[in-house]
């Protein structure tokens, strides 16, 4: 397909999990989500290596991009009627996943991969129902940054560098089977700077990625 078209790929994966209620107040759980394996994506491009005789010639690029495996565990506590507190942790295995494992350039000048490292993610949150009619919610999530300074250039299209996330929400039960929820999601700004591996640029040339986000969910 051309650069303005879309491409699809078949993929599959699986998930295993278990939950155990220790007592009426505390429950624990754990899960494993396998990598989500996809066929390679393909698109039309041109040879980007100026040192090769076929520089600029049309080529078909293939890129394997899977979703990493995730190990997770969590705990939930209900200390008061209507109040639920929860905490969980996750470990994402980017370093063994196609598309994220490799880094740098291929011989034809295409990017070999994003070069992400494995990360831990922790999250805490709470929900409180008022008279079983109205709910208020809050949560916080911290994620390690999978992108090192050396790989910033290769991740300009996908700057997943944010680390601190805050969520607020509310809900109301309108009827027995009808509920309306509103949520606010804020990602605190984070920036990272790294070198540009291009010999045509002056020594010490750098690129900076910066990202933040605000979302409202209904």
Go through each PLM region and give its residues.
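Outer-membrane beta-barrel porins/channels
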Residues: 1-218
